[in-house]
Amino acid sequence: MSLHIADHPLVKHKLGLMRQNDISTKDFRALASEIARLLTYEAVKDLPTEKHIVDGWAGPVEVDRLKGKKITIVPILRAGLGMMDGVIDLIPSAKVTVVGFYRDEETLEPVEYYVKTASEMSERVALIIDPMLATGGTLIATIDTLKKAGSKKIKGLFLVAAPEGIKKVQDAHPDVEIYVAAVDERLNEAGYILPGLGDAGDKIFGTR
């Protein structure tokens, strides 16, 4: 697995604002979208292009166009929806695949409750988006689901990640690339990232 940690002053500044405990829902939501946009820019640098001839103002001109099927964005419900706008801003023609999991209270393992994939998944780059990569369990389950649907190239975009989760995903799916704004210190006993952002879903949807 390739791990890409954003090294950009704008990302660091915006993430710092998100760490404030008294941040408003409006600001948290806006910053999540803005960082998602910046992470997307990095994550799609290797997309293939092909040459096309178009009618320019002074005659025919050769231009680059993206090659192949459109990307599919994969928000993990519910918090992943908070990063959607930032990704869609850059890739407005992207298809959307939606996955949802809940945690079994006895086994603590993720249980799939909703999946709706785009068509021809084997021909699309899949961009998983979720604010937090904590234990890695939900991400691994999501990757498993996408691979069963035919996905061959998968990338994940996260605001913050814990070393424990990164290691777990790396062991399970070494072919998946991870793009993250920051790698934090550790997980606490309850599985929350420290220092982290708190409950990103609650902050995005105003349900805290």
Swiss-Prot record:
GO terms for molecular function: GTP binding; magnesium ion binding; uracil phosphoribosyltransferase activity. Allosterically activated by GTP. Binds 1 Mg(2+) ion per subunit. The magnesium is bound as Mg-PRPP. SUPFAM superfamilies: PRTase-like (SSF53271). The keyword Transit peptide does not apply. The keyword Nucleotide-binding applies. GO terms for biological process: UMP salvage; uracil salvage. Coiled coil: none annotated. It catalyses: UMP + diphosphate = 5-phospho-alpha-D-ribose 1-diphosphate + uracil. Its EC number is 2.4.2.9. Pathway: Pyrimidine metabolism; UMP biosynthesis via salvage pathway; UMP from uracil: step 1/1. 5-phospho-alpha-D-ribose 1-diphosphate binds at R78, R103, D130, P131, M132, L133, A134, T135, G136, G137, T138, D199. Uracil binds at I193, G198, D199, A200. Its cofactor is Mg(2+). Keywords: Allosteric enzyme, Glycosyltransferase, GTP-binding, Magnesium, Nucleotide-binding, Transferase. Transmembrane segments: none annotated. CDD domains: PRTases_typeI. It holds the Pfam family UPRTase. Belongs to the UPRTase family. Catalyzes the conversion of uracil and 5-phospho-alpha-D-ribose 1-diphosphate (PRPP) to UMP and diphosphate. PANTHER family: ADENINE PHOSPHORIBOSYLTRANSFERASE, URACIL PHOSPHORIBOSYLTRANSFERASE, CHLOROPLASTIC. This is Uracil phosphoribosyltransferase. The gene is upp.
